[in-house]
């Protein structure tokens, strides 16, 4: 089953905790702390593969990378979690499902993007030894990995997009010009999903065709199947309008261009040709009259028959010439996010009571594992390094005032 839009959740692995451990070997004096570090959590990546043709292969709705292992004594570090690589079709656009932000456009074979970063492993207690802190009974816990919802939207990569009514013969034309084998039947809406085919002009020259489900009048208002799949012609260099010569082709062309323009006005400026199909059903004079009338609409018209092969060589040459002379359309590109360093804010909440809002400092606090009293000296270093001490002084906080930060409360004692 073809699927071109999908929402999934990706979760990176949590970092392993650092260990609180002390060397206790017989006849080894001054063993000291020897807690090892936790391993980094695995990250989640998306990778474009030409061998994957639909998002339907992503059977799960949540994808999680492996957690990092915890550190152990004797300075043994935990193993890092294994990264998770999810393969998606080439042409997949990746959006943040909650914000709508475009994160990546995976068009090249093997192109890879990081979508959820694994949490850092915590440091073991051997890292917190100082001349005045010889036996720290605390360590760092591992960080949580990133978690986010992604909206994956597949936009096929092709040179030429076939646009037409249901049963206009688009699939027959695709089959006649390429080695593709789309479903073909004498009733409307036989094509329920896009099909790709490669037109071989010579041993070195080729181009690709994309056939999408037929468009009907009112498609831009949600009728039929075609509008749902029009995104698949957004990347094409050239549009080929396929018309049934025996079924009001002039009116059909007008309707098709109206619906395409309602979806995206820029598509009307895309280089285009008209394939007047099924000319084997009409007399030569009637075909010429129709072709002349269609040409007055400003597009080149080529009478063809997918059934008999009439006009197909000329159509191939005309399409190939247009493809070679037309650059790929410009698509919106992801905008790199700028990392904004969060500052420190001191907010009075009552007389002599202050709340400190500092995300980076709160991150340090959340990761302390073990004896918080023993970690007080380390936290004071963090406060000074991150600007908390300076912010408290600037706000006029006095000795003995109550300070809250990251779920902790303490009496403020100014540094001497």
UniProtKB/Swiss-Prot annotation:
Protein location: Cytoplasm
Annotated stretches, region: Disordered: 25-44, 62-82
Compositional bias (Gly residues): 32-42
SUPFAM superfamilies for this protein: Obg GTP-binding protein C-terminal domain (SSF102741), Obg GTP-binding protein N-terminal domain (SSF82051), P-loop containing nucleoside triphosphate hydrolases (SSF52540)
Domain Obg span(s) in chain numbering: 1-157
Residues binding GTP, per UniProt: 164-171, 189-193, 211-214, 277-280, 305-307
Xref: InterPro entries: G_OBG, GTP-bd, GTP-bd_Obg/CgtA, GTP-bd_prot_GTP1/OBG_C_sf, GTP1-OBG_CS, GTP1_OBG_dom, GTP1_OBG_dom_sf, OBG_GTPase
Domain OCT residues, every copy: 336-414
Keyword field: Cytoplasm, GTP-binding, Hydrolase, Magnesium, Metal-binding, Nucleotide-binding
Annotated Basic and acidic residues bias: 63-72
Documented EC number(s): 3.6.5.-
GO biological process terms, semicolon-separated: ribosome biogenesis
Chief location category: cytoplasm
Cofactors required: Mg(2+)
GO cellular component labels: cytoplasm
Positions with a binding annotation for Mg(2+): 171, 191
Superkingdom classification of source: Bacteria
GO molecular function annotation: GTP binding; GTPase activity; magnesium ion binding
Chain ranges of the OBG-type G domain: 158-324
Recorded family membership: Belongs to the TRAFAC class OBG-HflX-like GTPase superfamily. OBG GTPase family.
UniProt subunit comment: Monomer.
NCBIfam families for the chain: Obg_CgtA, Obg_CgtA_exten, PRK12296.1, PRK12297.1, PRK12299.1
Its biological purpose: An essential GTPase which binds GTP, GDP and possibly (p)ppGpp with moderate affinity, with high nucleotide exchange rates and a fairly low GTP hydrolysis rate. Plays a role in control of the cell cycle, stress response, ribosome biogenesis and in those bacteria that undergo differentiation, in morphogenesis control.
Name assigned to this protein: GTPase Obg
Originating organism: Thermus thermophilus (strain ATCC BAA-163 / DSM 7039 / HB27)
Source taxonomy: Bacteria, Thermotogati, Deinococcota, Deinococci, Thermales
